[in-house]
Structure formats: C-alpha cells, structure tokens
Amino acid sequence: MMIDTRFPVYSLLERAADLLVHILGLLALGCGVMWLVHTALLSHAAVETGVTLLYCGGILGTCLSSAAYNFCPSCRLKGGLQRVDQSVIFIAIAATYTPFILLGGRGMASRWFCGLLWAMALAGVVLKMGFFTWSRRFHVMPYLCVAWVFFLCPDPPVWRLPGTTFPLLVLGLVFYCIGVVFYMRPRMPFSNVLWHVMVVLGAGTHMAAVGALLLYCARTPPMG
C-alpha cells in the first residue's frame, strides 16, 4: 500500500484515454522521425544528419520512457522508471533545440551556446537521477529554465530562422506551456491525459519546424 501512494492514481477511463494518446502519439511521431531521417540523409551533410538523429533519439526516448513509467504497475521498478522519465525530458529539450541552434546559426557563438544548453540539460539529469526527492521541491522550474534559455542565444542568425521554422518553434513551446498548466493540476480529471496530448502536439509542431529547416538547408547554401 505504501508503494501505491507514491504514484498518482487514475480512473480506468483516464488510463484508457492516456494509453490511446501514447499509442497514437508514438505512431505519429514515429512516422515523423522516419520522414526527418530520410530528409536529412538526402542532404548528404554530416551536420544535418547528426543533429536530426540526435533530435529523433531525444523525442523517441522521452516517448518510450513516458509509456514505460505511466503503464508500469506500482512497484519498485516504477520508481526507477519515474526518475528516468523525468530525466529524459531534459535530454529531449536540449535535443529539440540543437538543430535550430547549429543549423540556424553555425557560428562559434551558437556552438558555445549549444554546449551550455547541453550542460544545463545534463545537470538536470544528474539532479533527477541523484537527488530525486530533493529536486521535486522545484517542480517544473528546471525544465522551464532549460526550455526558455534558448531565447538567450547570442548568435543573431538563430533569430532569423527561415520560413515557418520560427513560428512553428514558438507554437510548439505554447503547446508545452499549456500542457504544464494541466500537469500542475493533478486533481483535475484527465489532467494527465491532457498534459500528454499537449506534449504530442508540441513535439509534432517542433518536428515540423525541424523538417522545414532541413528542407531550407537542402535548397540553400549554409547559413551564418
């Protein structure tokens, strides 16, 4: 009984709806990953291919870890999966911004800033994996700090991302922030389901933004 109280308890209908969201989300994002990898490989450029594979790995990793944690029965293993699930989010955030920073900027400032972003993400992983109970007092703030630090990027070309790339990037962030509102209200019916719906929408929108950037890079000389 003590183990059960460590984790949120949802109704059968909520769990069924959440399972449906995870299945549809994995299928949709899986198709998106295949499209992105195909598009990146057509460029025959190491940077485009590398950042795309990194991004796709981060997105799939967070989807799979979320499914593993949310649908594992309450037991000792679930506690470990919870740490992994909350840690991988930092990796996914850094992996999401990497294509925009390195392909959008390509200057030395972008490279240093990308390194700073990953250092923050890895610090978040250490925080969650090594100091999980203590880290919970900060709730979602570490994630928001890593997510919004992108807008401090000092390389001007990053702010001139082509076409629909930047609007899609911002829209994805809006979806995530709406999701955080649901996440912060665990007693609201279907809050966990709505949180995951917003995550899928945010990830899908960012995936479209990465795709738009890859298509632009394939048609034009390197930026920056």
Predicted segments with their positions:
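Multi-pass alpha-helical transmembrane bundles in non-GPCR membrane proteins
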Residues: 1-224
